[in-house]
């Protein structure tokens, strides 16, 4: 790969991780990449369109971006939260994170189209602003969105505060919006970086029908398995209300110390209730792919749960619909069904920064 073009004077842990995954995928070859928990032979996969970032054209001052975590807003639109974003290219001008765009798309099969930006003053600007102010400096390297959820008329965004370098988590925190994501306020809740032995840094969540929000958590370094928490939906801002699921005295129970419910090397995750089931999608850093599980409940035995590979990693210049170079993310777009799933998937060509974008994938036939 070519010499790195850095976005700051500090090292890029995410770049190192993605480069490692790409090398591993190339070294394993097609046979290893195909040895996932379940082959995706029954799936129909379509690369729909690049939504934002490189290869999408500049929209709302966004020329390079990743993640695109989607949520349904209280007013019925879609909101997509993005991570590190620049006006032109990685390491370029107007670095900000998180930013968010709106979509009124109702037919996902036609492709998501953005029609507005979130953030204070966004409706009077042509540039999507950082959702809240902080300086990208020696203390706050950057703040990355982890997941977004809507509970009633309020939205919550979990964010990962990095510093002094990317991948070193100072803490994570909870923000809220009462105007469908137009403006955001800090709830006052900060989660310690070492909560659950570092397994509550990158999280995903879904609202159950029992009054609880269920949360899978892992580290931000792609070297840990996942733990499970729950919190009453009306107590989101109270740290003491977050209950771990753990194994002790011969059994699993809420309130036991958090125990990994599945080992591995987890990256970005997306947990959602869908079609009477629960679905978890995640970037499997160990296998260089995006996997999925369909569950009856988040407390299912994940060791024995069926797992399906949705997308494999691949090499630049040798991609197809199911083999995607330097992929990560894999977030479920509202409006999906288990049999017709739409995901936002990120790519970053860490060798030359020519690709740093979010793409929409359609996956049919999972169930």
Regions picked out by a protein language model, each given a short descriptive name:
Residues 41-60, 72-141, 150-195, 210, ...:
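Beta-rich carbohydrate-recognition and catalytic domains
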Residues 1-12, 21-31, 36-39:
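N-terminal secretory signal peptides
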Residues 324:
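Short glycine-biased active-site loop of nucleotidyltransferases that positions the nucleotide triphosphate
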Residues 22, 67-71, 175:
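Short, well-ordered alpha-helical packing segments
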Residues 66-69, 142-147, 200-204, 267-270, ...:
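Beta-propeller and closely related beta-sheet repeat lectin domains
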């Amino acid at each position: 790969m070519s010499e790195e073009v850095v976005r700051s004077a500090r090292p890029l842990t995410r770049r190192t991780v993605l480069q490692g995954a790409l090398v591993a995928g190339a070294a394993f070859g097609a046979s290893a990449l195909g040895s996932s928990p379940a082959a995706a032979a029954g799936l129909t996969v379509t690369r729909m369109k690049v939504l934002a970032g490189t290869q999408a054209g500049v929209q709302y001052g966004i020329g390079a971006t990743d993640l695109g975590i989607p949520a349904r807003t209280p007013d019925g639109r879609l909101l997509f939260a993005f991570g590190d974003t620049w006006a032109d290219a990685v390491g370029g001008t107007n670095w900000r994170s998180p930013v968010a765009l709106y979509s009124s798309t109702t037919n996902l099969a036609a492709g998501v189209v953005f029609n507005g930006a979130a953030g204070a003053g966004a409706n009077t600007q042509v540039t999507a602003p950082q959702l809240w102010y902080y300086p990208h400096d020696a203390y706050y390297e950057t703040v990355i969105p982890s997941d977004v959820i809507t509970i009633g008329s309020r939205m919550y965004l979990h964010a990962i505060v990095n510093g002094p370098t990317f991948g070193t988590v100072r803490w994570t925190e909870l923000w809220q919006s009462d105007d469908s994501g137009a403006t955001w306020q800090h709830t006052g809740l900060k989660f310690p970086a070492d909560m659950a032995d570092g397994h509550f840094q990158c999280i995903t969540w879904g609202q159950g029908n029992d009054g609880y929000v269920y949360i899978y958590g892992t580290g931000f370094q792609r070297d840990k398995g996942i733990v499970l928490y729950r919190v009453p939906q009306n107590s989101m801002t109270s740290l003491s209300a977050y209950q771990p699921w753990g194994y002790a005295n011969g059994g699993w129970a809420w309130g036991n110390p958090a125990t990994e419910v599945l080992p591995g090397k987890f990256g970005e995750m997306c947990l959602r209730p869908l079609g009477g089931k629960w679905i978890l999608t995640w970037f499997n850093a160990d296998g260089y792919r995006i996997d999925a599980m369909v569950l009856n409940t988040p407390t299912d035995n994940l060791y024995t749960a069926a797992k399906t590979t949705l997308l494999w990693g691949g090499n630049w210049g040798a991609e197809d619909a199911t083999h995607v170079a330097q992929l990560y993310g894999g977030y479920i777009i509202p409006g999906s069904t288990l049999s017709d799933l739409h995901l936002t998937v990120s790519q970053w060509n860490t060798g030359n920064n020519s690709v740093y974008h979010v793409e929409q994938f359609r996956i049919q036939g999972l169930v």
